[in-house]
């Protein structure tokens, strides 16, 4: 925040986009529970803050592909924000239009009228929290590995490894072909795993196998 504000104070006009797609999925007490968007909105007149949210993640409706965009800025009055909203609506109509209307309608109905909506959401959060905790402990057991280094993680659905100069795509293919494990290669040097889709009793074995696969390739 300090760095962004200092640049804004120098006279630069800044657009800052806050990716809040996983907002609310915080598993550690010390994790910041407020979005940077909140602070950016009131930080400086030269800052336009944009927040992207995703019901797909935050409401745990995987596959619905529902997103939201919110604008804020200290220098923007209602007239300016209304104009920006109309421009955004025009862009949406000219591109994706209302292609996800069924998903939007289903989610809205559940949020308004679902008798067990909050209870179901809490149950799913607790499930993700438990998987996260097991995943974190499993990764910590391999902290001395020279071939994979886990990036810090404390929220959301995923975690990732730095492949320490080796090819993440090579490891991805090796894990898929030999162990039927699916992972994502990010820019050739990062391998992402989704603990959200793994049963808790299989997470330890998953992590052990990923490290084993890396050792087979690079040691």
Give the predicted meaning of each segment.
Residues 19, 67, 107, 128, ...:
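Generic structural signal for small/hydrophobic residues in well-ordered secondary structure
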Residues 1-64, 68, 77:
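Active-site pre-lysine segment of PLP-dependent enzymes
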Residues 101, 108, 121-136, 147-162, ...:
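Conserved glycine-rich beta-strand-loop-beta hairpin in the small C-terminal domain of fold type I
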Residues 3, 106, 134-138, 174, ...:
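Amphipathic alpha-helical segments that form well-ordered structural scaffolds
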Residues 45, 173-219:
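PLP-dependent enzyme catalytic core of the Aspartate aminotransferase-like
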Residues 22-24, 55-59, 74-76, 112, ...:
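Short, solvent-exposed loop/turn segments at secondary-structure junctions
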